[in-house]
């Protein structure tokens, strides 16, 4: 028997092609996707504008795979974290951050992460595998459902999606790209390009490839203003150095001017990357690339070799960048009391690749 397809894996075009292969009209895809994404209905028998024959065919050949919600926590500040478990027993985490004028959902692209950045708790958990397109998309679908049920039916509360959870999205390019297409499709979640952000640690070839097919918002986990330091705290820099990264981002920003350019993420680590000398190096490095700098207070976790910079040092760093002509903001820490803040997402990663030595021997 042929394995059933998971509808969450399919973009509108891919699903239309699938219907044609079944001897059906391509417009059936939009009918089904409207039920799935707009009405949040995945029981084919409830798709009342489909014929009985078509519903029977869908029941035989297609399905919707939902993960199990094994944890649902709400922080003091209203941030909400879910742990989703897939059939393979790996679990990943997604975080909803409500604000007065928006609701941001942070989702994962991999079970774990192989990049071994020593300031990130996710990296310590190791890496198992890439998530499928459907496993990425369903995080948004299920989060909308869970928020909808508790917020008087207001499904518009999730206004932004950021691929900043577990994993490096651009290593999982072939699964992430269709997911972003579904996020932005009118027959999917209908988000605008400026409301979908992909965060990368700097997979340079994939940034070039991404530029050729989309112009969604791009964030770069920079964290250091020179190669010597970045080689230590963002190890992928040993493969793709700052010169190549900045050049790739400058080209991407040319396609992305209407979205404000690149968002540069910079975690503030006490005594490591937080001096005014580092700020000057950062200002020089980013001089010709439009964008903004987001300073992130480090969120500590057990046995971490790092501490967060003092608030005074973070503000001093910000003010230096602002005087140098940059838009520089300090990210407000959200959800740290439930381990939902930046760098704290772990989930459960089975058959993982351990990275302990990366943490034990760090020296700034």
From Swiss-Prot:
The active site is at residues 93, 342. It is found in: Cytoplasm. It comes from the Bacteria. S-adenosyl-L-methionine binds at residues 167-168, 199, 221-223, 299. GO terms for molecular function: 4 iron, 4 sulfur cluster binding; metal ion binding; rRNA (adenine(2503)-C2-)-methyltransferase activity; rRNA binding; tRNA (adenine(37)-C2)-methyltransferase activity; tRNA binding. Its EC number is 2.1.1.192. It is an enzyme of class 2 (transferase). Its main location: cytoplasm. Disulfide bonds join 106-342. Its cofactor is [4Fe-4S] cluster. Residues 99-337 form the Radical SAM core domain. Specifically methylates position 2 of adenine 2503 in 23S rRNA and position 2 of adenine 37 in tRNAs. m2A2503 modification seems to play a crucial role in the proofreading step occurring at the peptidyl transferase center and thus would serve to optimize ribosomal fidelity. HAMAP family: RNA_methyltr_RlmN (MF_01849). This is Dual-specificity RNA methyltransferase RlmN. The gene is rlmN.
